[in-house]
């Protein structure tokens, strides 16, 4: 082909392709001329391309004619014990050298070819050690295989820095020692390290500092323990093989640092458990192989650090049960292999959380009850597509055995001696594609009639091999060949439960028994078994009985009794009997046994005594089974004052009951009750709260008159109850026949007070916590009496009487002018008061009384009739309107006042001219004198006087007026027996002139300031008597009149007696003492003066 090109040098170029080919040949022609023809293959070898195969020739030395073009040289399976480096001088292209299965005792030198050799295979020689100097010349070495030699140790000088080795195989040697840092020289390049089949017994912590290593093979060594942090430094490791060692324990953090590892092989070891601590840090693990170990139990939280695990292999272990949620944290798991274990119990919810699981292998276990009786064992496996139960002990399939597996596609029940399948056991599996059943023990009765047509309808009969074993007429026939009418139930060969065990509760130490009975028409041997929490009791104490159930003797009844002697807490659980014969097993209901212990106190509350404001602490703790609940009561109830005030603290898990800031109300009996289902016990403790003495009601100063009775009350509280002692001054009180004390000394009564009783009284309250004192100053005034002869009194009381009388007269005039009607009413000297219909009576329920409570007077006498003085000089009262005062109350200390009979007419004349209102001289001739007994709180009137009060409600805007003014005599007329008597302070002969020389003028001025109601009734209807004289009225302000006088006048200006009469002047004196007592509930009312008929 080159010749035409060369021959066409002078010819024109016909195509670009030919030109490129010609240029290429011109470039190669000098090389061909220089190299000459290709060297022939060595005489004792074979050639294939650039590979020279001299293996298996029995060579003891290198061939001498190795061609220079050799890239791969195979010298394996010879008898080479040493290598001459000169034989490799002319091999510039050599990259692979196979020297395995020779008799070399050291790593050979390949002379000039060593620098470009990439792969060196030295396995199956007799090399005893590796020296760093032997490997320094291999500057391009990436693969070094030293497996199956006699290397016994690896020191830190074996592999120097320099050779970029990526794969190092030291498997099959006799290495027993790995020196720390032995592979540090390869840290920049090493990707795969094989140390399998050696004699390594221990791995040093941080033995491997190989950050680029991805695979580490340590299988078939003698490692027994993996310490924590052993593999730290292997940051890129993805596959770790530790199978076939003798590992029995993985300490916490054994695989710490392997955060990128995907596959972990731990098969064929001696592990008995896998806990979360040993798998700590394996966050990226996808496959975990733990088959052929001795794992007997799976811990619930053992997989908390492997949440990305896709495949878990636990085959060939010693698992006997799968507990609830024991695999719940493996939410990403897709394949779970549990074959060849001894699993007999799968708890309900054992696979809960495995929502991604697709393949579940349970072959060759001892599963029976899970499929025959339990429902819900496979709940949570929503994505499961393949379930294999081959080679178990399943004899029947319950209706709900596979509930929760609606998406299942492949179900393998082969290798089980299945005898019956309950109706619709597989109906809910809509996606089922394969159902493997292989059994020749089917009981072909009416309960199996549904199965053949269902399998045919779902086209699953090809995977089912099912043969009848009963009745005899159908024995050996396939269920698909039996006519539907032949599936009949003439008897019940399989046992039927007729007596179920019952749930019970027992005290510790008692004997308990469960009874279970079943009936069957079969004569085949019957076996009995009891299960506790779905696990068979191997050494159960049972009694078994059998007797004829039917009269014809065809049905037998079998009874089994389980005895539990001296039960303990370990006997608690759910018990179930299983009665089995050749045709199947029957499972009873599960009866629960609860073992209880009556509560007993470990801490009991004790009586405590504390002060107020401190903290009370009560302890109470009890034991029992179930754990007793602790409850507290106070005085037999649940009303805790401290709880309402949030001062009570009870911790649920604590034994202490606290009350902070203790108060006296917290005292009482506290009961601690411990209760569980076995019973209850209680213990009591008394909380005594100590309180320092204190007064309930403050002790006040008192003022009494000579001859009266005074009571001083010292009502004290405290705990213990305080002892009360009375002192006068600084000395203990000397008791006389006038002094009386209650039994507890809280009330001191002094009768017939004398001047010497005045002074400072001290009440001393003391108990064990301290002493408190309270003081009261008792003042005694001279005795004061009331005489009927009408003595002149102080001008202040006269001013009050005159103000009220004049105010009443003005109001009568206003009523008269505005209403323009006459209404007569008669007044007699009787106990009755006649009131016009428009004026509400203070004795009736109409209207309201003016709330005047300036002063009151008290009496020790009982109630009397309305407004009349008795023969003894006492004025009666209306008892229905005013309550009877305390007979021991202190008498009023107001001097008795005498009101004269004369009125000053001049101010009223001026008022008549201005407003057209009649003055008092037109309404009454001759004033009447009224006496108020200041000591007896009664009103005293002169005999024969016609003086009647008329209360007016504040709310009454238009009270009616009398029909007309009564004719009267001169305004200077006086009754002869009502003249004022002379007193020690002075006399009041005939009481000349007005007693109110200036008050009338002031009242008149006040009236003029506020326009009165118009006579035609069109004026302001709110102008009432209450507004006229009430001190708080905003329309009429008497500040310039009544209050501008002396203080005695200001206090006495509204003085009224409780029955509505003006007080009579008694024992006038130059200075008047204002009244200081006040009786609650007393009301002062305005008065109307009626003329004498």
Swiss-Prot record:
LRR repeats: 69-90, 93-114, 116-137, 140-161, 164-185, 189-210, 212-233, 236-257, 260-281, 284-305, 308-329, 332-353, 356-378, 383-404, 407-428
Keywords: Cell membrane, Disulfide bond, Glycoprotein, Immunoglobulin domain, Leucine-rich repeat, Membrane, Repeat, Signal, Transmembrane, Transmembrane helix
Keyword Coiled coil among record annotations: no
Domain spans labelled Ig-like C2-type: 495-594, 599-688, 693-779
Gene Ontology terms describing biological process: hair cycle process; innervation; otolith morphogenesis; sensory perception of sound
SUPFAM superfamilies named among the record's database cross-references: Immunoglobulin (SSF48726), L domain-like (SSF52058)
Disulfide links within the chain: 45-54, 444-468, 446-489, 516-577, 620-672, 714-763
Membrane-crossing segments per the record: 795-815
Gene Ontology cellular component list: extracellular matrix; extracellular space; plasma membrane
Alphabetical list of PROSITE patterns matching this protein: IG_LIKE, LRR
Induction: By EGF.
Extracellular side stretches: 35-794
Residues of this chain annotated as glycosylated in UniProt: 74, 150, 246, 292, 318, 684
UniProt comment concerning the protein's domains: Contains LRR and Ig-domains that can mediate low-affinity interaction with EGFR. The LRRs and the Ig-domains are each sufficient for EGFR/ERBB1 binding. This interaction is abolished only when both the LRRs and the Ig-domains are deleted.
Described purpose of this protein according to its UniProt entry: Acts as a feedback negative regulator of signaling by receptor tyrosine kinases, through a mechanism that involves enhancement of receptor ubiquitination and accelerated intracellular degradation.
Protein name per Swiss-Prot or TrEMBL: Leucine-rich repeats and immunoglobulin-like domains protein 1
Organism: Homo sapiens
């Amino acid at each position: 082909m080159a010749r035409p090109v060369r021959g066409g040098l002078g010819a024109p170029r016909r195509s670009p392709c030919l030109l490129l080919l010609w240029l290429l040949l011109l470039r190669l022609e000098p090389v061909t001329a220089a190299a000459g023809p290709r060297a022939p293959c060595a005489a004792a070898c074979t050639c294939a391309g650039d590979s020279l195969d001299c293996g298996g020739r029995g060579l003891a030395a290198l061939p001498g004619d190795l061609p220079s073009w050799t890239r791969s040289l195979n010298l394996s399976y010879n008898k080479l014990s040493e290598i001459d480096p000169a034989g490799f001088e002319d091999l510039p292209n050599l990259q692979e050298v196979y020297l395995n299965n020779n008799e070399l005792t050291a790593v050979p030198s390949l002379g000039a070819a060593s620098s470009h050799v990439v792969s060196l295979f030295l396995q199956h020689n007799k090399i005893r050690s590796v020296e760093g100097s032997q490997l320094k010349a291999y500057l391009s070495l990436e693969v070094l295989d030293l497996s199956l030699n006699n290397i016994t140790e690896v020191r830190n000088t074996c592999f120097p820095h320099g050779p970029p080795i990526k794969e190092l195989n030291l498997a099959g040697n006799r290495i027993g020692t790995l020196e720390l840092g032995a592979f540090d020289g390869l840290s920049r390049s090493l990707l795969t390290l094989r140390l399998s089949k050696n004699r390594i017994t221990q791995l040093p912590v941080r033995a491997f500092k190989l950050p680029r290593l991805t695979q580490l093979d340590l299988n078939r060594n003698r490692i027994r323990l993996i310490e924590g942090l052993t593999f730290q430094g292997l940051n890129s490791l993805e596959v770790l093989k530790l199978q076939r060692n003798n590992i029995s324990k993985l300490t916490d953090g054994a695989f710490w640092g392997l955060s990128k590892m995907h596959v972990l092989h731990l098969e064929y070891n001696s592990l008995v458990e896998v806990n979360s601590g040993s798998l700590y840090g394996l966050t990226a693990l996808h496959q975990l192989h733990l088959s052929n170990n001795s794992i007997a139990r799976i811990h619930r939280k053992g997989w908390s650090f492997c949440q990305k695990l896709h495949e878990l292999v636990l085959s060939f272990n010693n698992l006997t049960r799968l507990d609830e949620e024991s695999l719940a944290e493996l939410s990403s798991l897709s394949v779970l292999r549990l074959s060849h274990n001894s699993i007999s119990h799968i708890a309900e919810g054992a696979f809960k959380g495995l929502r991604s699981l697709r393949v579940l292998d349970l072959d060759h276990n001892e599963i029976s009850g899970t499929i025959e009786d339990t429902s819900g064992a496979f709940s949570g496996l929503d994505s499961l597509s393949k379930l294999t139960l081959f080679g178990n002990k399943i004899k029947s399939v319950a209706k709900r055995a596979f509930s929760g597996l609606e998406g299942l596609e492949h179900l393998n029940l082969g290798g089980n001696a299945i005898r019956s399948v309950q109706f619709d056991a597989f109906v809910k599996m809509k996606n089922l594609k394969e159902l493997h059943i292989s059994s020749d023990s089917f009981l072909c009765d009416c309960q199996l009639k549904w199965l053949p047509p269902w399998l045919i309808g779902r086209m699953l009969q090809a995977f089912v091999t099912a043969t009848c074993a009963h009745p005899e007429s159908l024995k050996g026939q396939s269920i698909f060949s039996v006519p539907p009418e032949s599936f009949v139930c003439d008897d019940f060969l399989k046992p039927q439960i007729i007596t179920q065990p019952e749930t019970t509760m027992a005290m510790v130490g008692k004997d308990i028994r469960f009874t279970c009975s079943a009936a069957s028409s079969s004569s085949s041997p019957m076996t009995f078994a009891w299960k506790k929490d779905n696990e068979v009791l191997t050494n159960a104490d049972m009694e078994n009985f059998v007797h004829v159930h039917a009269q014809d003797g065809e049905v037998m009844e079998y009874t089994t009794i389980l005895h539990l002697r001296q039960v303990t807490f370990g006997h608690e659980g759910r018990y179930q009997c299983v009665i089995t014969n050749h045709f199947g097993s029957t499972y009873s209901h599960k009866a629960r046994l609860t073992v209880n212990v009556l509560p007993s106190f470990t801490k009991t509350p004790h009586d405590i005594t504390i002060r107020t404001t401190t903290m009370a602490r009560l302890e109470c703790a009890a034991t029992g089974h179930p754990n007793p609940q602790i409850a507290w009561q106070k005085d037999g109830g649940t009303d805790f004052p401290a709880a309402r005030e949030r001062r009570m603290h009870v911790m649920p898990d604590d034994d202490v009951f606290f009350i902070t800031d203790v108060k006296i109300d917290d005292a009482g009996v506290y009961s601690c009750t411990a209760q569980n289902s076995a019973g209850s016990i209680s213990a009591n403790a008394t909380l005594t709260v100590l309180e320092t003495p204190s007064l309930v009601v403050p002790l006040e100063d008192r003022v009494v008159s000579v001859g009266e009775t005074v009571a001083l009350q010292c009502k004290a509280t405290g705990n213990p109850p305080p002892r009360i002692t009375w002192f006068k001054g600084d000395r203990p009180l000397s008791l006389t026949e006038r002094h009386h004390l209650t039994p507890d000394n809280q009330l001191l009564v002094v009768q017939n007070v004398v001047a010497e009783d005045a002074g400072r009284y001290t009440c001393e309250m003391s108990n064990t916590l301290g002493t408190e004192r309270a003081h009261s100053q008792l003042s005694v005034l001279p005795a004061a009496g009331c005489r009927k002869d009408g003595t002149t009194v102080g001008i202040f009381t006269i001013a009050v009487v005159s103000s009220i009388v004049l105010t009443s007269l003005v109001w009568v005039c206003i009523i008269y002018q505005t209403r323009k009607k006459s209404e007569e009413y008669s007044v007699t000297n009787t106990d009755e008061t006649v009131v016009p219909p428009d004026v509400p009576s203070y004795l009736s329920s109409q209207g309201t009384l003016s709330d005047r409570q300036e002063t009151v007077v008290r009496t020790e006498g009982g109630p009397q009739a309305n407004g009349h003085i008795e023969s003894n000089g006492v004025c009666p009262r209306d008892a229905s309107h005013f309550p009877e005062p305390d007979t021991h109350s202190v008498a009023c200390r107001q001097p008795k006042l005498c009101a004269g009979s004369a009125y000053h007419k001049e101010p009223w004349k001026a008022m008549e001219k201005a407003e057209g209102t009649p003055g008092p001289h037109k309404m009454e001739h001759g004033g009447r004198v009224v006496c108020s007994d200041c000591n007896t709180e009664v009103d005293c009137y002169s005999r024969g006087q016609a003086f009647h009060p008329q209360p007016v409600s504040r709310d009454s805007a238009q009270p009616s007026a009398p029909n007309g003014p009564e004719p009267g005599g001169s305004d200077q007329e006086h009754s002869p027996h009502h003249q004022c008597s002379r007193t020690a302070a002075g006399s009041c002969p005939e009481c000349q002139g007005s007693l109110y020389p200036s008050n009338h003028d002031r009242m008149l001025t006040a009236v003029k300031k506020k326009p009165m109601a118009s006579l035609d009734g069109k004026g302001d209807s709110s102008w009432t008597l209450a507004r006229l004289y009430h001190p708080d009225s905003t329309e009429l302000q008497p500040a310039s009149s009544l209050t501008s006088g002396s203080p005695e006048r200001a206090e006495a200006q509204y003085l009224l007696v409780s029955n509505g009469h003006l007080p009579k002047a008694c024992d006038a004196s130059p200075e008047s003492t204002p009244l200081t007592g006040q009786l609650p509930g007393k009301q002062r009312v305005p008065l109307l003066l009626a003329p004498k008929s």
